[in-house]
Amino acid sequence: MLHPRARTMLLLSLPAVAIGIASSLILIVVMKIASVLQNLLWQRLPGTLGIAQDSPIWIIGVLTLTGIAVGLVIRFSQGHAGPDPACEPLIGAPVPPSALPGLIVALILGLAGGVSLGPEHPIMTVNIALAVAIGARLLPRVNRMEWTILASAGTIGALFGTPVAAALIFSQTLNGSSEVPLWDRLFAPLMAAAAGALTTGLFFHPHFSLPIAHYGQMEMTDILSGAIVAAIAIAAGMVAVWCLPRLHAMMNQMKNPVLVLGIGGFILGILGVIGGPVSLFKGLDEMQQMVANQAFSTSDYFLLAVIKLAALVVAAASGFRGGRIFPAVFVGVALGLMLHEHVPAVPAAITVSCAILGIVLVVTRDGWLSLFMAAVVVPNTTLLPLLCIVMLPAWLLLAGKPMMMVNRPKQQPPHDNV
């Protein structure tokens, strides 16, 4: 017979697996639709019209029209496409289900149109809202927080293709003063994360790792080099942190989301022309292209890092629906490659991984997630001790510093209760 503790853990196992599978399927469907639309906008249409897909007029035109389209969705859809991601953490309160259709449409348009944001925040919002709404009907005795945790764990597993990230994140958020052992509380979330990751793996495998030269043995000087790289990435990220609320306030003085997002899309188009097609979209596929292109110089990597960081700030400040983690990883890769080109004596594995650690730490203020992203992009077990050590001064630098988030005006609710 099972111990009562084991039976308690098993109670939410079936709902956890169902939520994990559903979280992954929602992500897969959204990404597939966005991919089809992206192919139409950036491959078939310009080919049919006889226009180069990387021509300035096409890049500016598509991104401007994308901004206008997203603005129309936010303006006229019920619930106004959910809360503004610039004002929200990755895992937030559930929104009314009525806001979800508009949010999904706005996300798909942004992903396909080349906006420099990832899918993580809107997908998380959708999955949490559905899990809470459906779970409250089927199992009303389970509180909303439990459904929120299961949905967010399933989404994290689906996004990254592994339950490891969820285990790391929730090991700190669930480690309270309760007498219930930590792994008892992690059991159901990890079931959801594993189900989400396995379901994603049936359809495609998220490819984060980069073909970077293997790092052999850690030296004492490497720790200093890594800490300096992380500090440079943090400094770049804090510039974005300073700019975001100010640009957000300036853009939203216009009040009309169609105008705000249209202007935001136009600015993103100009940035895309300067940075080229590799600086567009969420950044995961593009960072693979960036590493594969041997023609890039130090100045090219620097330009890509600056353009992508600026595009991330503009997209978030304008109100596009999307997440900031994936484009931040692109910025980290560009910074790391730039620093390696500038100082070849420092291995690229160190510069890239430590730059990712620093910039993701600025964006998320989550040490485990930052370590995870650095470790999966540059998969090398020799780097893990170095990354853990470099995390310490990086965390000290950010202690008490503002987060990459806009404080919501007090008179505005987080979302429309319609």
UniProtKB/Swiss-Prot annotation:
Residue ranges crossing the lipid bilayer per the database entry: 10-30, 54-74, 99-119, 120-140, 149-169, 186-206, 223-243, 258-278, 300-320, 322-342, 343-363, 371-391
Compartment list: Cell membrane
GO molecular function annotations of the record: chloride transmembrane transporter activity; monoatomic ion channel activity
UniProt KW Cell membrane keyword: yes
GO cellular component: plasma membrane
Membrane topology: Multi-pass membrane protein
UniProt-listed CDD domains: Voltage_gated_ClC
Keywords: Cell membrane, Ion channel, Ion transport, Membrane, Transmembrane, Transmembrane helix, Transport
Record carries keyword Oxidoreductase: no
One Pfam family, short name: Voltage_CLC
Coarse class of the protein's main subcellular location: membrane
Domain of life: Bacteria
Annotated family: Belongs to the chloride channel (TC 2.A.49) family.
PANTHER family with a match to the protein in the record: CHLORIDE CHANNEL PROTEIN CLC-E, ION-TRANSPORT PROTEIN YFEO-RELATED
Protein name, UniProt field: Putative ion-transport protein YfeO
Organism: Shigella sonnei (strain Ss046)
Highest classification ranks of the organism: Bacteria, Pseudomonadati, Pseudomonadota, Gammaproteobacteria, Enterobacterales
